[in-house]
Amino acid sequence: MGGFTSIWHWVIVLLVIVLLFGAKKIPELAKGLGSGIKNFKKAVKDDEEEAKNEPKTLDAQATQTKVHESSEIKSKQES
C-alpha cells in the first residue's frame, strides 16, 4: 500500500510504457527528456551566476551615488 515499492509495480509500469510508446520511441523520449533536464540545469546555473554579479553592481552604484550626494551637500554648505 506504500506506493511503488514492489518490483511488480515497476514491471507493470514499464510494460504499459512500452505498449503506449513502442520500443523504438522510448530512446527518443529519453534523449529529449535528458536534453530538457540539461538545458534546465544550464539555465539555473546561468541565473545563479547572474544573481551573484548583480548585487555587486547595485552596491557600487549606490556607493557612488552616496559619495556624489555627500560631496554636493558639502559644497553647498561651504558656499
Swiss-Prot record:
<dbReference type="GO" id="GO:0008320">
    <property type="term" value="F:protein transmembrane transporter activity"/>
</dbReference>
<comment type="subunit">
    <text>The Tat system comprises two distinct complexes: a TatABC complex, containing multiple copies of TatA, TatB and TatC subunits, and a separate TatA complex, containing only TatA subunits. Substrates initially bind to the TatABC complex, which probably triggers association of the separate TatA complex to form the active translocon.</text>
</comment>
<feature type="transmembrane region" description="Helical">
    <location>
        <begin position="1"/>
        <end position="21"/>
    </location>
</feature>
<keyword id="KW-1003">Cell membrane</keyword>
<feature type="compositionally biased region" description="Basic and acidic residues">
    <location>
        <begin position="66"/>
        <end position="79"/>
    </location>
</feature>
<dbReference type="InterPro" id="IPR006312">
    <property type="entry name" value="TatA/E"/>
</dbReference>
<keyword id="KW-0653">Protein transport</keyword>
<dbReference type="InterPro" id="IPR003369">
    <property type="entry name" value="TatA/B/E"/>
</dbReference>
<protein>
    <recommendedName>
        <fullName>Sec-independent protein translocase protein TatA</fullName>
    </recommendedName>
</protein>
<keyword id="KW-0813">Transport</keyword>
<keyword id="KW-0812">Transmembrane</keyword>
<dbReference type="GO" id="GO:0043953">
    <property type="term" value="P:protein transport by the Tat complex"/>
</dbReference>
<comment type="function">
    <text>Part of the twin-arginine translocation (Tat) system that transports large folded proteins containing a characteristic twin-arginine motif in their signal peptide across membranes. TatA could form the protein-conducting channel of the Tat system.</text>
</comment>
<comment type="similarity">
    <text>Belongs to the TatA/E family.</text>
</comment>
<keyword id="KW-1133">Transmembrane helix</keyword>
<keyword id="KW-0472">Membrane</keyword>
<keyword id="KW-0811">Translocation</keyword>
<keyword id="KW-0997">Cell inner membrane</keyword>
<dbReference type="GO" id="GO:0033281">
    <property type="term" value="C:TAT protein transport complex"/>
</dbReference>
<feature type="region of interest" description="Disordered">
    <location>
        <begin position="48"/>
        <end position="79"/>
    </location>
</feature>
<dbReference type="Pfam" id="PF02416">
    <property type="entry name" value="TatA_B_E"/>
</dbReference>
